[in-house]
Amino acid sequence: MEAEKVKCLIIGSGPAGYTAAIYAARANLSPVLYEGLQPGGQLTTTTDIENFPGYPEGISGTQMMDDLRRQAERFGTDLRYGVATAADLSRSPYKITIDEEKVIEAQTIIIATGAAAKYLGLEDEKKYAGMGVSACATCDGFFYRKKVVAVVGGGDTACEEASYLAGLASKVYLIVRKPFLRASKIMQERVMKDEK
């Protein structure tokens, strides 16, 4: 099978991937961007983004990622669905295999694969994923309506999830390792003043 040759290959479609695509396209590098398993990245599961410049009233993660996607397309980014499954980065041109079948040779590769939810590593945790264990309040929050729930973590993501769930659940416990929260002050205040 002959490899497709491209100037610039971007792997990942979160904010970093789309931003790289916008700049690469404006520089006439004809970027090809593979969106991965979750087009738009982890931000698509976030309800309110309030700390990104340019959105004074805040914006949903889905809307923000749609905006970035459209902007990347507007400048000529070739957006494709697929997952990088192998890489040979030993010399240029770099070779990336997509979905274990298509090989792409790229002069430049930008890897923007982003983040994924962290699990605790408890026994049977993955077994109960989607059946009481969740890593996405906006995805699964409806199932916990009027129930007692617990969120593990003390950072912004955990506090945002707890705040969202407080609108659905009867009670929300925030479980943290340390005697303090690591979240931004505004998120701490929001969580602490909610009676749930």
Language-model-derived ranges and their functions:
Residues 44-103, 184-196:
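N-terminal Rossmann-like dinucleotide/flavin-binding domain of flavoprotein oxidoreductases
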Residues 2-5, 10-36, 129, 135-184:
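Rossmann-like dinucleotide/flavin-binding elements
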Residues 24-25, 46-49, 123-127, 164-167, ...:
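Short, glycine/charged-enriched secondary-structure capping and boundary segments
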Residues 39, 48, 83, 115-116, ...:
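A generic "binding-loop/recognition-motif" signal
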Residues 1-11, 32, 77-147:
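FAD-binding core/adjacent interface of flavoenzyme oxidoreductases
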Residues 39-40, 87, 118, 180-181:
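Active-site loop signature of alpha/beta-hydrolase-fold enzymes
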Residues 33-45:
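N-terminal glycine-rich anion-binding loops that anchor highly charged ligand groups
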